[in-house]
Every structure is written in structure tokens, then in C-alpha cells.
Design a protein with these regions (language model features):
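Terminal low-complexity tails and localization/encapsulation signals of metabolic enzymes
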Residues: 1-14, 232, 246-250, 287
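N-terminal helix-loop segment corresponding to the beta1-alpha1 unit
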Residues: 1-188, 192-201
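Short Gly/Pro-enriched turn/cap motifs at secondary-structure boundaries
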Residues: 62, 70, 231-239, 245-246, ...
């Protein structure tokens, strides 16, 4: 196992992980699966909130060491408990940073600065450190002081508005957005590591979770910018691909999911269901007609 880890892409990279819950920790977890060593830094006064999430253990409080959510999101780590409100705790944290390559944190903007562990403070300890800050809407701009978790920045980023059924309220997507933010952070850290390898320079990465959602709704944004159209929720239907939905079948709670993207697929589908003549029917001749 040791030999396998030593040959991993990020072998020799150490990450000081100050982050909590999902978007921050999972970014470090993804990098740990590539071989990086991750040290999770917590405080008993402000431990990772995901430790209290039960899910598969039932509705009861699972205890700080038994949360399946924490076990998944913050897997594959070393850990240390520090009181960052005391000078001794901050100094120990800086000693960890001094021997690390990356810092990951997802506190609200300004928190790490007040603790004495902001980017400007840590580059004095480790000049080439890669410092990733992840927050709801980033550390700059008119909304920088907005705090929030996935249900909030899923709405701010626009994904919630177009997700769900037309006759129902928007669906916030919750944990899926956290994972997307974590993937964005992990990718940014990999790019920063490559940059440092070539130039010797570290950098401060400011990730806005709301902006990271843009990759999901690029077509929606372009439609609004170019055509002034605001798309709405449409369930599992698609504007062009048809048929494209979940359809009820005979029997109790029986469904079939059909997604036809091309005319060739439509021809194959009509043959498969025993109605090849539908391919010749002008009402269904192309996706726009269907």
C-alpha cells in the first residue's frame, strides 16, 4: 500500500485543511485520493458540523465520531485539535502550514484573517503556500459578506430556479452544489500546484460557490444574455430532445425513462417498441415536431 501511495500523482503534497462540512473538506478529500496527505485542523469549540449529521444512523444524534456524512466527506486524513482563539493554537497551526503545500478553508470571508491565519499572515510563514478560500459568493464584490450553505448559493447561482417541475417550487439541489464547488476547488488547487512547480510561486485562490454553478447552466445564461429569455423549470423534459421524460407504465409505481437525442435513436426506438411506422409519420419526423 505504501509503495502504491508513493507513486500517486500528489505523493509528497501536504494539505492543511481548516475547512468544515462539505464544500471545503471534500475538495481536500479528492486530492487525498490522488496521494496528498491531508491534516484536518478542528477545535472542540467549533468542530466540523458534519460530525453531527446522522443520516444512515437514524434521526438520533450519532456522536462526534460516528457520523457517516463526516466519514465520507472528511475521509483519508490525519487530524489535530487546536484552539485557534488562543495564541498557542494559532502558532501550532502556523507550524503545520510551514511544512504544508496547500491550505484549504471555507469560513466566511474575514474569519481566518481575524484569527491571524489569513493569506497575508501565512505567506510570511510559507511564501509559496497555495491558499484556497471557498465561500458562498467569494471574498470580493458587492455580496462578499453574504453567508450561506448550498441551498442559498444554489439559488444565488441560478441553478435552483430552473431545477424542478413547472408547477412546483424551485429545487435547491443542496449537497450536489457543495460537491460541484469542491470539484472546482480541487481543480483550481491542481492548477496552482502546476503553476508553482513551473514558477515557484504560490497563490491565493478565491472560490465562489455560486459562480462555480455557472458550468451547469451555461446554455441558460447565454440564452438570457443573447435572447433576453428566462428559462423556467420543466422537470425531465428537454427543449429539443424528444421524447425525453419519465413516463408512467402499467402497474403500481412503475415508470420508464426515455431520452431520445437524435433521429437515428428515434428510428431505433420505434422499431424496439413495435411501431416503426412512427418514423415515417410527419408529426414525429424530427425532434422539433416530436
Amino acid at each position: 500500500m505504501g509503495q502504491e501511495m508513493n507513486s500517486s500523482a500528489l505523493a509528497g503534497i501536504r494539505i492543511a485543511d481548516f475547512s468544515q462540512y462539505w464544500a471545503g473538506p471534500y475538495a481536500a478529500t479528492l486530492l487525498s485520493y490522488m496521494g496528498a496527505e491531508v491534516i484536518k485542523i478542528e477545535s472542540m469549540k467549533r468542530y466540523d458540523w458534519s460530525r453531527t449529521q446522522s443520516l444512515t444512523t437514524g434521526l438520533r444524534y450519532p456522536g462526534l465520531e460516528h457520523s457517516p456524512v463526516f466519514a465520507e466527506v472528511s475521509a483519508n486524513r490525519l487530524a489535530v485539535t487546536l484552539d485557534l482563539t488562543k495564541p498557542e493554537g494559532v502558532e501550532l497551526a502556523k507550524r503545520i502550514v510551514r511544512v504544508s503545500d496547500v491550505v484549504v478553508q471555507n469560513f466566511s470571508p474575514g474569519v481566518m484573517d481575524r484569527l491571524g491565519l489569513g493569506y497575508e499572515s501565512l505567506i510570511e510563514v510559507k511564501p509559496d503556500i497555495i491558499y484556497l478560500s471557498s465561500s458562498a459568493v467569494g471574498a470580493t464584490g458587492p455580496e462578499w459578506n453574504y453567508r450561506g450553505y448550498a441551498p442559498l448559493f444554489a439559488c444565488q447561482g441560478g441553478a435552483a430556479y430552473i431545477t424542478g417541475y413547472a408547477d412546483e417550487r424551485p429545487y435547491p439541489m443542496t449537497g450536489r452544489i457543495d460537491i460541484l464547488s469542491a470539484m472546482t476547488s480541487a481543480f483550481a488547487i491542481l492548477a496552482a500546484l502546476s503553476h508553482r512547480q513551473r514558477t515557484g510561486e504560490g497563490q491565493h485562490i478565491d472560490v465562489s460557490s455560486a459562480e462555480s454553478i455557472a458550468v451547469l447552466i451555461g446554455d441558460v445564461l447565454m440564452d438570457y444574455i443573447m435572447n433576453s429569455r428566462s428559462q423556467t423549470r420543466r422537470g425531465n423534459r428537454d427543449d429539443i430532445m424528444a421524447p425525453h421524460n419519465c413516463y408512467r407504465c402499467k402497474g403500481d409505481d412503475k415508470w420508464v425513462s426515455i431520452a431520445i437525442s437524435t433521429d437515428e435513436e428515434w428510428d431505433a426506438f420505434t422499431n424496439a417498441i413495435g411501431n416503426p411506422e412512427w418514423s415515417e409519420d410527419r408529426r414525429f419526423s424530427d425532434a422539433y415536431s416530436r
